[in-house]
Amino acid sequence: MVRTRFAPSPTGYMHLGNARTGIFSYLFARHHNGTFVLRIEDTDRERSTKEFEDSIIEDLKWLGIEWDEFYRQSERFDIYKEYAKKLIDSGHAYYCFCKEEDIEKQREEAYAQGKAYRYPGTCRHLSKEDVEDRLKSGESYVIRFKVPDGQIVSFEDMIRGNISINVDDFGDFVIVRSDGSSVYNFVAVIDDALMKITHVIRGEDHISNTPKQILIYEALGFKPPEFAHLPVILGEDRTKLSKRHGGVSVRFYKENGYCPEALFNYLCLLGWSSEKVGKEVISKEEAVKYFDIKDINLSPAVFSHDKLYWLNGVYIREILPEDRLLEDLLSFLEKAYGTVDIEYLKKIVKATRKEYNTYLEAVEKLRPFFKEKELDEVAKEELSKIDRKVFELLKQEIESLEEITPENLKGVVKNIQKSTSLKPKDVWHALRIALTGSLEGIAIDVIASILPKEEVLKRLSRYT
């Protein structure tokens, strides 16, 4: 049975690259009717926080990614200690008492010579008695894995094919820190083995970790899982996606009014393309049905804010059920304008749904329905050219209407045009300035026909 895992570290908000990794791991498990495991990798005591863990969990739920099993590495330290001891007892690991300042000095010397640092194995051959004496005296230590000399580690990557790496360059690497906490490459192996993970899908930055992990699997007698290393995501300038490219976290898009279905859709097609899909708008169910790891492109994917913005607009305009759209919009609008009547909002959404691509954009574009706005500079300039009597005429005409509709507003404008020398454009501009404070935005006949009549008259009164 297929078992995949997503193993984020709670050291920051979830990056879009991590989210895509989680989505691909999720799709692979669901496509094969397997199990999807969420594991929080919080062994970095200094940088891991509960706030970021909660954020990751919340963002995954928001994206619609549900897991079957949940683990937290900080609750498994006793297990890691047990397996570290097994490696020591079997001769695959050893205590290292080298001082950190000496290691740092060696590292600096290697860098100065243009070489990568490799631990020289100083403590590799200490006698059992020497080790016991130093442990009894309370001397600080780390535990290092003993890397076999002259070995080539090979594995078949599900995306890249065969990868072979000479492990001689690694040196004996640390698996347990001096504070007793275990290192990523060690705990990832223990957890993946004990959780019976069959397929590990992760970013290509982990390729160099894989040989180290395979050595640990072999030393403990575990069968390694299959590995798939995803290509990196680039910004539109073809450099690795980072904060300088703008929003790069799931949290950013959530807070800026994107809907989860659109972000899920965009990320799952970022580097994955299938002839079976053949379209840019795809549901989670379709993604599960058609997902094949072999269809992942080996070349880096380019993240486009514009493409995601467009796709989100498609979801808002055409795909989201009205009740979901209302619910999502309501939360954004009430943050900006206070309590919003749901029936009033239904009228607004019915008439304006095609006018915005994000909820945050909707907050600004729908402002005239909830709050008066001060005139912008263009509106001020236009107002200076308008005969102020038009506002009084508009007020009189609208007062006489039983209700305001787009059709009878045309009649209002026509009546004013007949009784004055004003052009229709001037009358419409006057109405727009009074109601919205701007010459741009949603059609003014739509705004005027949805706003309560008394509110329309009140705003006109400011200019009479």
Curated annotation (Swiss-Prot):
Its cofactor is Zn(2+). A motif ('HIGH' region) lies at residues 8-18. GO terms for biological process: glutamyl-tRNA aminoacylation. A motif ('KMSKS' region) lies at residues 240-244. ATP binds at K243. Binds 1 zinc ion per subunit. Its EC number is 6.1.1.17. It is found in: Cytoplasm. Disulfide bonds: none annotated. Keywords: Aminoacyl-tRNA synthetase, ATP-binding, Cytoplasm, Ligase, Metal-binding, Nucleotide-binding, Protein biosynthesis, Zinc. The keyword Plastid does not apply. SUPFAM superfamilies: An anticodon-binding domain of class I aminoacyl-tRNA synthetases (SSF48163), Nucleotidylyl transferase (SSF52374). GO terms for cellular component: cytosol. GO terms for molecular function: ATP binding; glutamate-tRNA ligase activity; tRNA binding; zinc ion binding. It catalyses: tRNA(Glu) + L-glutamate + ATP = L-glutamyl-tRNA(Glu) + AMP + diphosphate. Zn(2+) binds at C96, C98, C123, H125. Monomer. Belongs to the class-I aminoacyl-tRNA synthetase family. Glutamate--tRNA ligase type 1 subfamily. PANTHER family: GLUTAMATE--TRNA LIGASE (PTHR43311), GLUTAMATE--TRNA LIGASE, MITOCHONDRIAL-RELATED (PTHR43311:SF2). Catalyzes the attachment of glutamate to tRNA(Glu) in a two-step reaction: glutamate is first activated by ATP to form Glu-AMP and then transferred to the acceptor end of tRNA(Glu). This is Glutamate--tRNA ligase. It comes from Hydrogenobaculum sp. (strain Y04AAS1). The lineage of its organism: Bacteria, Pseudomonadati, Aquificota, Aquificia, Aquificales. The gene is gltX.
